[in-house]
Amino acid sequence: MKIAVPKEIKNHEYRVALTPSGARELVGRGHDVIVQAAAGEGAGFSDADFEAAGARLEADVAKLWDDAELILKVKEPQAEEVARLSAGQTLFTYLHLAAEESLTKGLLDSGATCIAYETITAPEGGLPLLAPMSTVAGRMAVQAGAHSLEKAQGGAGILLPGVPGVAPARVTVIGGGVVGENAARMALGLGAEVTVLDKSIPRLETLDDRYQGRMKTVFSTADALEEAVRESDLIIGAVLVPGAAAPKLITRDMLSDMKPGSVLVDVAIDQGGCFETSKPTTHAEPTYVVDGVVHYCVANMPGAVARTSTQALTNATLPFVVALADKGWQKALADDDHFAAGLNVHDGKLTYRAVAEAFGLEYVEAASLIG
């Protein structure tokens, strides 16, 4: 199979969808891996690295896309990339369609088969292709929040761990999943006072046991959120409704209760954000201020640590890429119900219910198309 790996074009996105090691595995199975020239440079992988792995380089972007049967990406396709897709091609990447109606309609119009990393499930539960980037994003959220608390960044001028005689920052993490746990773990390690809010008592029990009571665990209610808003120096939104838009948990009105110079980091921005005042930002201009509260809403946080992220992503995606390349999308998904959960769009049909409901579009059962 002809497998194309384009260079990511989203603002400050330095990751690449495949490492040279991953390319070598695919080439060894008889597949033709075509990598856009310079695609891996941002992640520290040279063209020579890919050539040594047996991949071919292609400088002509149009030819790369036109010749491809399977296209591997990291971020959702940008407008010019959607225009390059055609019927018969398979796109495998993060899509996050519930936050992007125009992208959803563009992919439907393309006629391509689009499989989303983030909606693939695992037999033991969880989202195996979202987890590695969620781990990175959770840890980065604390770094970003700590930096945003600095006075020069518009923050209150608070050092996250404090110093002897001065209290540490109060950090609240909304959501105790992969992102939330990694954010809480990072903040705890830096010496902050950490509280995690979640709707799942079993999850809170797990966190309490795992971290031996060193972080507060609180059942998430309206009262708990209001208290967090009043007391926290840094709030990290780590809420996930798989494949659907994130709920707005902190409203514009609630900002008036926050401390001046406090910080909101919205890791859920890929799914529309979990704060009413959130809007996507970039690594070039990561923050803005609303009512005295600093907002950090970068939609591709792991892109800033591209080498780590690319390696972690390829480790997770490669078995699925191998299945697609060896079997074709239809048999690969027919053989694995958990993989089939990743199908979002096929031949002009929308096959992910939460996205269809978000935009009032017709929904078609994926199973009816997989066979």
Swiss-Prot record:
<feature type="binding site">
    <location>
        <position position="134"/>
    </location>
    <ligand>
        <name>NAD(+)</name>
    </ligand>
</feature>
<keyword id="KW-0520">NAD</keyword>
<dbReference type="InterPro" id="IPR036291">
    <property type="entry name" value="NAD(P)-bd_dom_sf"/>
</dbReference>
<dbReference type="GO" id="GO:0000286">
    <property type="term" value="F:alanine dehydrogenase activity"/>
</dbReference>
<feature type="binding site">
    <location>
        <begin position="298"/>
        <end position="301"/>
    </location>
    <ligand>
        <name>NAD(+)</name>
    </ligand>
</feature>
<dbReference type="Pfam" id="PF05222">
    <property type="entry name" value="AlaDh_PNT_N"/>
</dbReference>
<comment type="similarity">
    <text>Belongs to the AlaDH/PNT family.</text>
</comment>
<keyword id="KW-0460">Magnesium</keyword>
<feature type="active site" description="Proton donor/acceptor">
    <location>
        <position position="96"/>
    </location>
</feature>
<feature type="binding site">
    <location>
        <begin position="267"/>
        <end position="270"/>
    </location>
    <ligand>
        <name>NAD(+)</name>
    </ligand>
</feature>
<dbReference type="Pfam" id="PF01262">
    <property type="entry name" value="AlaDh_PNT_C"/>
</dbReference>
<feature type="binding site">
    <location>
        <position position="203"/>
    </location>
    <ligand>
        <name>NAD(+)</name>
    </ligand>
</feature>
<keyword id="KW-0479">Metal-binding</keyword>
<dbReference type="GO" id="GO:0042853">
    <property type="term" value="P:L-alanine catabolic process"/>
</dbReference>
<dbReference type="GO" id="GO:0005886">
    <property type="term" value="C:plasma membrane"/>
</dbReference>
<feature type="binding site">
    <location>
        <position position="15"/>
    </location>
    <ligand>
        <name>substrate</name>
    </ligand>
</feature>
<dbReference type="GO" id="GO:0000166">
    <property type="term" value="F:nucleotide binding"/>
</dbReference>
<feature type="active site" description="Proton donor/acceptor">
    <location>
        <position position="270"/>
    </location>
</feature>
<dbReference type="InterPro" id="IPR008141">
    <property type="entry name" value="Ala_DH"/>
</dbReference>
<dbReference type="InterPro" id="IPR007886">
    <property type="entry name" value="AlaDH/PNT_N"/>
</dbReference>
<keyword id="KW-0547">Nucleotide-binding</keyword>
<feature type="binding site">
    <location>
        <begin position="239"/>
        <end position="240"/>
    </location>
    <ligand>
        <name>NAD(+)</name>
    </ligand>
</feature>
<dbReference type="InterPro" id="IPR008143">
    <property type="entry name" value="Ala_DH/PNT_CS2"/>
</dbReference>
<feature type="binding site">
    <location>
        <position position="220"/>
    </location>
    <ligand>
        <name>NAD(+)</name>
    </ligand>
</feature>
<dbReference type="InterPro" id="IPR007698">
    <property type="entry name" value="AlaDH/PNT_NAD(H)-bd"/>
</dbReference>
<protein>
    <recommendedName>
        <fullName>Alanine dehydrogenase</fullName>
        <ecNumber>1.4.1.1</ecNumber>
    </recommendedName>
</protein>
<feature type="binding site">
    <location>
        <position position="198"/>
    </location>
    <ligand>
        <name>NAD(+)</name>
    </ligand>
</feature>
<dbReference type="GO" id="GO:0046872">
    <property type="term" value="F:metal ion binding"/>
</dbReference>
<feature type="binding site">
    <location>
        <position position="279"/>
    </location>
    <ligand>
        <name>NAD(+)</name>
    </ligand>
</feature>
<feature type="binding site">
    <location>
        <position position="75"/>
    </location>
    <ligand>
        <name>substrate</name>
    </ligand>
</feature>
<comment type="function">
    <text>Catalyzes the reversible reductive amination of pyruvate to L-alanine.</text>
</comment>
<keyword id="KW-0560">Oxidoreductase</keyword>
<comment type="pathway">
    <text>Amino-acid degradation; L-alanine degradation via dehydrogenase pathway; NH(3) and pyruvate from L-alanine: step 1/1.</text>
</comment>
